[in-house]
Amino acid sequence: MASQHLQANPHAEGEWSTGFCDCFSDCQNCCITWLCPCITFGQVADIVDRGNTSCGTAGALYVLLAAITGCGCLYSCIYRGKIRAQYNIRGDGCTDCLKHFCCELCALTQEYRELKHRGFDMSLGWAGNVEKQQNQGGVAMGAPAFQGGMSR
């Protein structure tokens, strides 16, 4: 399953879909990240690593590294580079590290929004997004289909 490639929503090459300080454009994720950044990081890592690193494993490693070194950004900045490489977004490793070191929460929420903008349902993880795409019968992952809430 991890070897499958999902094609997401197209976006202008070379740029992030949202600004670095646009944390409040997704208030729910902003609050979750502020309270427990390991959750957002785990969700990002699961998608970026295409299911090879689970949300729980990545989140636990993030917490462990943050507890030991006081700097979870040592781990999370690597994923910013992976996102840039996957989507041809301009930047470099030094800037990635600085952004995570200076404002970890802004960096994590921007990465979360980027993946969400590209069509991933962050709550499903990689495997859930693959399954969702297969159930829709598509080859490439486009914009997520609207699924209504509970009805009576």
From Swiss-Prot:
Q: How does it sit in the membrane?
A: Single-pass membrane protein
**Principal localisation:** membrane
User: Which keywords describe this protein according to UniProt?
Assistant: Membrane, Transmembrane, Transmembrane helix
Annotated compartments: Membrane
What parts of the sequence cross the membrane? 57-79
**One cellular component term from this protein's GO annotations in UniProt:** membrane
Say which family it is in: Belongs to the cornifelin family.
The task this protein performs is described as: May be involved in heavy metals transport.
Protein name in the entry:
Protein PLANT CADMIUM RESISTANCE 3
Task: Give the species this sequence originates from.
Answer: Arabidopsis thaliana
Gene name for this UniProt entry: PCR3
